[in-house]
Design a protein with these regions (language model features):
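Accessory interaction regions appended to the cores of large information-processing enzymes
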Residues: 1-143
Length: 143
């Protein structure tokens, strides 16, 4: 979806022969496409607040995995039962398969919970990859 966009129609005219609902919709669509691209849009990705609870001996492996998944570790606290609670922000797209990977890293002991936090601008390489993937889908539909 496109968010944070405001459009104001400042001028227009009506002609009894050439004007129709379809003509106005087409004109609006063309104006939006031009204005949208002139505004240099960016792709936003959802970010989750993540808490991972793991035994002390697995902390390094889990933190390395979070970094590999583009996560930002915000802090780490001991729960005083030999476990660490790691808090991080991470793109939600990087959480696919995390349950399986965390269980593998921790021998089935690690737990995690997350919730949506906000949207952030995706890195340039991710934006490029997503735009190319969507363009390929559109090209397939045009065939």
């Amino acid at each position: 979806p496109v968010v944070g966009v405001k459009a104001t129609l400042v001028d227009g005219s009506y002609h009894p022969v050439d004007s129709s609902e379809m003509a106005f919709k087409t004109a609006a669509m063309m104006a939006f496409k031009k204005g949208f691209m002139d505004a240099n849009p960016v792709l936003l990705e959802p970010i989750a607040s993540l808490k991972v609870t793991v035994p002390d001996k697995f902390t390094g492996d889990v933190m390395g995995d979070l970094n590999r998944r583009r996560g930002r570790v915000l802090g780490m606290n001991s729960d005083h039962h030999g476990k660490q609670v790691i808090e991080a922000d991470i793109p939600m797209s990087e959480l696919f398969g995390y349950n399986t990977d965390l269980r593998s890293m921790t021998g089935g002991i690690g737990l995690y919970e997350y919730e949506f936090s906000r949207y952030e601008q995706a890195p340039g390489d991710i934006q490029k990859k997503e735009v190319e993937a969507r363009a390929a889908k559109v090209d397939k539909l045009d065939v």
